[in-house]
Amino acid sequence: MAVSTIFSQDSNSKRLLIAFAITTLFMVTEAIGGWLSGSLALLADAGHMLTDSAALFIALMAVHFSQRKPDPRHTFGYLRLTTLAAFVNAAALLLIVILIVWEAVHRFFSPHEVMGTPMLIIAIAGLLANIFCFWILHKGEEEKNINVRAAALHVLSDLLGSVGAMIAAIVILTTGWTPIDPILSVLVSVLILRSAWRLLKESFHELLEGAPQEIDINKLRKDLCTNIYEVRNIHHVHLWQVGEQRLMTLHAQVIPPLDHDALLQRIQDYLLHHYRISHATVQMEYQHCGTPDCGINQAAPADGHHRHHHHE
Protein backbone atom coordinates (compact mmCIF):
# COMPACT_ATOMS: atom_id res chain seq x y z
CA MET A 1 0.00 0.00 0.00
CA ALA A 2 1.36 3.41 -0.96
CA VAL A 3 2.48 5.79 1.79
CA SER A 4 0.00 8.44 0.58
CA THR A 5 -2.81 5.89 0.87
CA ILE A 6 -1.79 5.02 4.44
CA PHE A 7 -1.80 8.68 5.50
CA SER A 8 -5.16 9.17 3.78
CA GLN A 9 -6.66 6.18 5.57
CA ASP A 10 -5.36 7.42 8.96
CA SER A 11 -6.90 10.84 8.30
CA ASN A 12 -10.20 9.27 7.26
CA SER A 13 -10.22 7.11 10.39
CA LYS A 14 -9.82 10.13 12.70
CA ARG A 15 -12.54 12.07 10.89
CA LEU A 16 -14.95 9.16 11.11
CA LEU A 17 -14.22 8.51 14.80
CA ILE A 18 -14.93 12.13 15.80
CA ALA A 19 -18.09 12.25 13.69
CA PHE A 20 -19.26 8.90 15.14
CA ALA A 21 -18.88 10.09 18.75
CA ILE A 22 -20.74 13.38 18.15
CA THR A 23 -23.49 11.77 16.08
CA THR A 24 -24.16 9.04 18.64
CA LEU A 25 -24.44 11.58 21.48
CA PHE A 26 -26.96 13.76 19.63
CA MET A 27 -28.87 10.76 18.32
CA VAL A 28 -29.74 9.83 21.90
CA THR A 29 -30.60 13.47 22.69
CA GLU A 30 -32.90 13.84 19.68
CA ALA A 31 -34.63 10.51 20.28
CA ILE A 32 -35.50 11.54 23.84
CA GLY A 33 -36.55 15.02 22.71
CA GLY A 34 -38.69 13.68 19.88
CA TRP A 35 -40.43 11.25 22.20
CA LEU A 36 -41.12 13.95 24.81
CA SER A 37 -42.28 16.58 22.29
CA GLY A 38 -44.17 14.22 19.98
CA SER A 39 -42.33 15.57 16.92
CA LEU A 40 -42.07 13.27 13.91
CA ALA A 41 -39.43 15.57 12.43
CA LEU A 42 -37.24 15.09 15.51
CA LEU A 43 -37.90 11.35 15.65
CA ALA A 44 -37.14 11.12 11.93
CA ASP A 45 -33.94 13.05 12.49
CA ALA A 46 -33.06 10.77 15.41
CA GLY A 47 -33.72 7.80 13.15
CA HIS A 48 -31.38 9.33 10.59
CA MET A 49 -28.76 9.85 13.27
CA LEU A 50 -29.14 6.25 14.44
CA THR A 51 -28.39 5.06 10.94
CA ASP A 52 -25.65 7.68 10.72
CA SER A 53 -24.03 6.23 13.82
CA ALA A 54 -24.26 2.78 12.27
CA ALA A 55 -23.03 4.14 8.93
CA LEU A 56 -20.09 5.92 10.52
CA PHE A 57 -19.26 2.80 12.53
CA ILE A 58 -19.36 0.64 9.39
CA ALA A 59 -17.21 3.19 7.55
CA LEU A 60 -14.78 3.32 10.47
CA MET A 61 -14.46 -0.47 10.57
CA ALA A 62 -14.01 -0.57 6.80
CA VAL A 63 -11.12 1.90 7.02
CA HIS A 64 -9.59 -0.10 9.87
CA PHE A 65 -9.73 -3.44 8.07
CA SER A 66 -8.68 -1.92 4.73
CA GLN A 67 -5.31 -1.11 6.30
CA ARG A 68 -4.51 -4.80 6.64
CA LYS A 69 -1.68 -5.89 4.39
CA PRO A 70 -2.33 -8.12 1.36
CA ASP A 71 -1.99 -11.85 1.91
CA PRO A 72 -1.89 -14.90 -0.40
CA ARG A 73 -5.70 -15.16 -0.34
CA HIS A 74 -6.39 -11.41 -0.66
CA THR A 75 -3.66 -10.15 -2.97
CA PHE A 76 -5.14 -6.64 -3.21
CA GLY A 77 -5.61 -6.44 0.53
CA TYR A 78 -8.96 -5.36 1.98
CA LEU A 79 -9.36 -1.97 0.29
CA ARG A 80 -12.63 -2.97 -1.34
CA LEU A 81 -14.26 -3.06 2.11
CA THR A 82 -14.51 0.74 1.94
CA THR A 83 -16.52 0.49 -1.28
CA LEU A 84 -18.72 -2.24 0.18
CA ALA A 85 -19.38 -0.06 3.24
CA ALA A 86 -20.37 2.83 0.97
CA PHE A 87 -22.81 0.59 -0.91
CA VAL A 88 -24.40 -0.68 2.32
CA ASN A 89 -24.71 2.85 3.70
CA ALA A 90 -26.27 4.21 0.51
CA ALA A 91 -28.76 1.33 0.40
CA ALA A 92 -29.64 1.87 4.08
CA LEU A 93 -30.23 5.56 3.46
CA LEU A 94 -32.64 4.79 0.62
CA LEU A 95 -34.57 2.45 2.91
CA ILE A 96 -34.76 5.09 5.62
CA VAL A 97 -36.10 7.66 3.15
CA ILE A 98 -38.88 5.26 2.15
CA LEU A 99 -39.81 4.54 5.79
CA ILE A 100 -39.89 8.23 6.74
CA VAL A 101 -42.09 9.14 3.76
CA TRP A 102 -44.45 6.29 4.67
CA GLU A 103 -44.70 7.47 8.29
CA ALA A 104 -45.08 11.11 7.21
CA VAL A 105 -48.05 10.28 4.98
CA HIS A 106 -49.66 8.41 7.87
CA ARG A 107 -48.96 11.29 10.28
CA PHE A 108 -50.37 13.85 7.82
CA PHE A 109 -53.77 12.16 7.83
CA SER A 110 -53.62 11.38 11.56
CA PRO A 111 -52.08 14.49 13.17
CA HIS A 112 -50.38 14.27 16.56
CA GLU A 113 -49.80 17.04 19.07
CA VAL A 114 -46.30 18.50 18.73
CA MET A 115 -44.49 20.53 21.42
CA GLY A 116 -42.78 23.31 19.49
CA THR A 117 -40.34 24.70 22.09
CA PRO A 118 -38.39 21.51 23.00
CA MET A 119 -38.51 20.55 19.33
CA LEU A 120 -36.86 23.85 18.35
CA ILE A 121 -34.16 23.67 21.03
CA ILE A 122 -33.14 20.12 20.17
CA ALA A 123 -33.27 20.81 16.43
CA ILE A 124 -30.86 23.74 16.84
CA ALA A 125 -28.48 21.58 18.88
CA GLY A 126 -28.70 18.82 16.29
CA LEU A 127 -28.04 21.29 13.48
CA LEU A 128 -24.86 22.54 15.15
CA ALA A 129 -23.66 18.98 15.72
CA ASN A 130 -24.34 18.00 12.12
CA ILE A 131 -22.61 21.09 10.73
CA PHE A 132 -19.52 20.25 12.78
CA CYS A 133 -19.55 16.59 11.70
CA PHE A 134 -20.00 17.53 8.05
CA TRP A 135 -17.10 19.97 8.30
CA ILE A 136 -14.90 17.32 9.94
CA LEU A 137 -15.60 14.85 7.15
CA HIS A 138 -14.98 17.40 4.38
CA LYS A 139 -12.11 19.53 5.69
CA GLY A 140 -8.74 19.26 3.97
CA GLU A 141 -7.82 19.42 0.31
CA GLU A 142 -7.23 15.75 -0.36
CA GLU A 143 -9.85 13.79 -2.28
CA LYS A 144 -12.28 11.91 -0.05
CA ASN A 145 -12.87 8.26 -0.88
CA ILE A 146 -16.31 6.88 -1.60
CA ASN A 147 -16.60 5.46 1.92
CA VAL A 148 -16.14 8.87 3.58
CA ARG A 149 -18.45 10.50 1.04
CA ALA A 150 -21.16 7.95 1.87
CA ALA A 151 -20.79 8.70 5.57
CA ALA A 152 -20.85 12.44 4.85
CA LEU A 153 -24.07 12.01 2.86
CA HIS A 154 -25.70 10.46 5.92
CA VAL A 155 -24.58 13.45 7.98
CA LEU A 156 -25.85 15.85 5.30
CA SER A 157 -29.24 14.16 5.41
CA ASP A 158 -29.37 14.77 9.16
CA LEU A 159 -28.23 18.36 8.71
CA LEU A 160 -31.14 18.99 6.35
CA GLY A 161 -33.41 17.10 8.74
CA SER A 162 -32.42 19.43 11.57
CA VAL A 163 -33.14 22.45 9.36
CA GLY A 164 -36.55 20.97 8.55
CA ALA A 165 -37.28 20.34 12.23
CA MET A 166 -36.31 23.94 13.09
CA ILE A 167 -38.61 25.38 10.44
CA ALA A 168 -41.44 23.06 11.50
CA ALA A 169 -40.99 24.07 15.16
CA ILE A 170 -41.11 27.78 14.32
CA VAL A 171 -44.26 27.33 12.20
CA ILE A 172 -45.94 25.30 14.95
CA LEU A 173 -45.02 27.86 17.62
CA THR A 174 -46.33 30.79 15.57
CA THR A 175 -49.36 29.25 13.85
CA GLY A 176 -50.11 25.95 15.59
CA TRP A 177 -50.24 24.23 12.18
CA THR A 178 -48.82 20.75 12.90
CA PRO A 179 -49.05 19.26 9.35
CA ILE A 180 -45.89 21.23 8.54
CA ASP A 181 -43.96 18.58 10.51
CA PRO A 182 -44.62 15.60 8.17
CA ILE A 183 -44.56 17.84 5.08
CA LEU A 184 -41.01 18.98 5.81
CA SER A 185 -39.99 15.41 6.66
CA VAL A 186 -41.02 14.36 3.14
CA LEU A 187 -39.25 17.37 1.60
CA VAL A 188 -35.97 16.55 3.34
CA SER A 189 -36.27 12.90 2.30
CA VAL A 190 -36.75 13.87 -1.34
CA LEU A 191 -33.71 16.14 -1.21
CA ILE A 192 -31.56 13.25 0.02
CA LEU A 193 -33.00 10.64 -2.34
CA ARG A 194 -31.11 11.77 -5.45
CA SER A 195 -27.70 11.87 -3.76
CA ALA A 196 -28.24 8.49 -2.10
CA TRP A 197 -29.23 6.90 -5.41
CA ARG A 198 -26.21 8.39 -7.20
CA LEU A 199 -23.86 7.10 -4.50
CA LEU A 200 -25.49 3.67 -4.61
CA LYS A 201 -24.89 3.47 -8.37
CA GLU A 202 -21.30 4.68 -8.03
CA SER A 203 -20.39 2.16 -5.34
CA PHE A 204 -22.14 -0.65 -7.25
CA HIS A 205 -20.18 0.32 -10.38
CA GLU A 206 -16.94 0.11 -8.40
CA LEU A 207 -17.89 -3.25 -6.89
CA LEU A 208 -18.39 -4.53 -10.45
CA GLU A 209 -14.82 -3.38 -11.20
CA GLY A 210 -15.99 -0.72 -13.62
CA ALA A 211 -13.51 1.87 -14.86
CA PRO A 212 -13.49 5.21 -12.98
CA GLN A 213 -16.15 7.34 -14.64
CA GLU A 214 -13.88 10.37 -15.09
CA ILE A 215 -11.44 8.43 -17.30
CA ASP A 216 -12.14 8.07 -21.02
CA ILE A 217 -10.39 4.86 -22.12
CA ASN A 218 -10.24 5.88 -25.79
CA LYS A 219 -8.71 9.24 -24.88
CA LEU A 220 -6.17 7.51 -22.65
CA ARG A 221 -5.12 5.21 -25.50
CA LYS A 222 -4.72 8.13 -27.90
CA ASP A 223 -2.81 10.17 -25.31
CA LEU A 224 -0.23 7.43 -24.82
CA CYS A 225 0.26 7.05 -28.58
CA THR A 226 0.50 10.81 -29.10
CA ASN A 227 2.81 11.69 -26.21
CA ILE A 228 5.17 8.71 -26.18
CA TYR A 229 6.81 8.41 -29.59
CA GLU A 230 7.67 4.70 -29.41
CA VAL A 231 4.07 3.69 -28.65
CA ARG A 232 2.14 2.83 -31.80
CA ASN A 233 -0.97 1.18 -30.39
CA ILE A 234 -2.63 0.54 -27.03
CA HIS A 235 -5.07 -2.36 -26.73
CA HIS A 236 -6.44 -4.96 -24.30
CA VAL A 237 -6.94 -2.17 -21.76
CA HIS A 238 -8.46 -3.10 -18.39
CA LEU A 239 -8.95 -0.39 -15.78
CA TRP A 240 -10.59 -0.67 -12.37
CA GLN A 241 -10.40 0.74 -8.89
CA VAL A 242 -9.89 -0.86 -5.47
CA GLY A 243 -10.63 1.59 -2.68
CA GLU A 244 -8.67 4.72 -3.59
CA GLN A 245 -6.17 2.88 -5.80
CA ARG A 246 -6.56 2.80 -9.58
CA LEU A 247 -5.15 -0.24 -11.36
CA MET A 248 -4.62 -1.01 -15.03
CA THR A 249 -3.36 -3.70 -17.36
CA LEU A 250 -2.68 -3.00 -21.03
CA HIS A 251 -0.81 -4.16 -24.11
CA ALA A 252 1.39 -1.62 -25.89
CA GLN A 253 2.60 -2.16 -29.47
CA VAL A 254 5.88 -0.25 -29.63
CA ILE A 255 8.91 0.42 -31.79
CA PRO A 256 11.65 -1.82 -30.31
CA PRO A 257 13.29 0.57 -27.82
CA LEU A 258 16.96 0.98 -27.04
CA ASP A 259 16.09 0.79 -23.35
CA HIS A 260 13.07 -1.39 -22.59
CA ASP A 261 12.90 -0.55 -18.89
CA ALA A 262 13.15 3.20 -19.53
CA LEU A 263 10.21 3.07 -21.96
CA LEU A 264 8.18 1.03 -19.50
CA GLN A 265 8.88 3.60 -16.79
CA ARG A 266 7.83 6.47 -19.07
CA ILE A 267 4.50 4.77 -19.80
CA GLN A 268 3.84 4.13 -16.10
CA ASP A 269 4.87 7.67 -15.12
CA TYR A 270 2.53 9.13 -17.74
CA LEU A 271 -0.38 7.07 -16.42
CA LEU A 272 0.40 8.10 -12.84
CA HIS A 273 0.80 11.83 -13.46
CA HIS A 274 -2.03 12.31 -15.96
CA TYR A 275 -4.59 9.73 -14.79
CA ARG A 276 -3.56 8.95 -11.19
CA ILE A 277 -3.18 5.25 -12.08
CA SER A 278 -0.76 4.08 -9.41
CA HIS A 279 -0.38 0.45 -10.49
CA ALA A 280 -0.06 -0.36 -14.20
CA THR A 281 1.01 -3.70 -15.63
CA VAL A 282 2.23 -3.18 -19.20
CA GLN A 283 2.86 -5.91 -21.76
CA MET A 284 4.95 -4.57 -24.64
CA GLU A 285 4.67 -6.10 -28.10
CA TYR A 286 7.08 -5.68 -31.00
CA GLN A 287 4.92 -7.09 -33.80
CA HIS A 288 1.70 -6.26 -35.64
CA CYS A 289 -1.48 -6.37 -33.54
CA GLY A 290 -4.34 -8.13 -35.30
CA THR A 291 -7.10 -8.22 -32.66
CA PRO A 292 -10.36 -6.20 -33.04
CA ASP A 293 -9.42 -3.56 -30.44
CA CYS A 294 -6.21 -2.51 -32.23
CA GLY A 295 -7.81 0.19 -34.37
CA ILE A 296 -6.52 3.27 -32.58
CA ASN A 297 -3.30 4.76 -33.96
CA GLN A 298 -2.47 1.51 -35.72
CA ALA A 299 0.97 1.53 -37.37
CA ALA A 300 2.70 -0.82 -39.75
CA PRO A 301 4.45 -3.74 -38.08
CA ALA A 302 7.69 -2.73 -36.46
CA ASP A 303 10.93 -4.60 -37.11
CA GLY A 304 11.32 -7.73 -35.08
CA HIS A 305 9.10 -10.73 -34.58
CA HIS A 306 9.40 -11.55 -30.92
CA ARG A 307 7.08 -10.54 -28.10
CA HIS A 308 8.38 -9.44 -24.75
CA HIS A 309 6.25 -9.91 -21.65
CA HIS A 310 6.87 -7.61 -18.75
CA HIS A 311 4.75 -7.52 -15.63
CA GLU A 312 5.40 -5.16 -12.78
Curated annotation (Swiss-Prot):
Location(s), subcellular: Cell inner membrane
GO terms, biological process: zinc ion transmembrane transport
Q: Which family does it belong to?
A: Belongs to the cation diffusion facilitator (CDF) transporter (TC 2.A.4) family. SLC30A subfamily.
Q: Keywords for this entry?
A: Cell inner membrane, Cell membrane, Ion transport, Membrane, Transmembrane, Transmembrane helix, Transport, Zinc, Zinc transport
Residue ranges annotated as transmembrane are 16-36, 40-60, 81-101, 117-137, 153-173, 177-197
Establish whether keyword Zinc is in the entry. Answer: yes
Q: Which InterPro entries match?
A: Cation_efflux, Cation_efflux_CTD_sf, Cation_efflux_TMD_sf, CDF/SLC30A, Zn_transptr_ZitB
What is the protein's name according to its record?
Answer: Zinc transporter ZitB
Q: Which HAMAP family match?
A: ZitB
GO MF annotations, alphabetized: zinc ion transmembrane transporter activity
The protein's matches in SUPFAM superfamilies, at most eight in alphabetical order, are given as:
Cation efflux protein cytoplasmic domain-like, Cation efflux protein transmembrane domain-like
Concerning NCBIfam families, the annotation shows: CDF, PRK03557.1
Extract one GO cellular component term from the record: plasma membrane
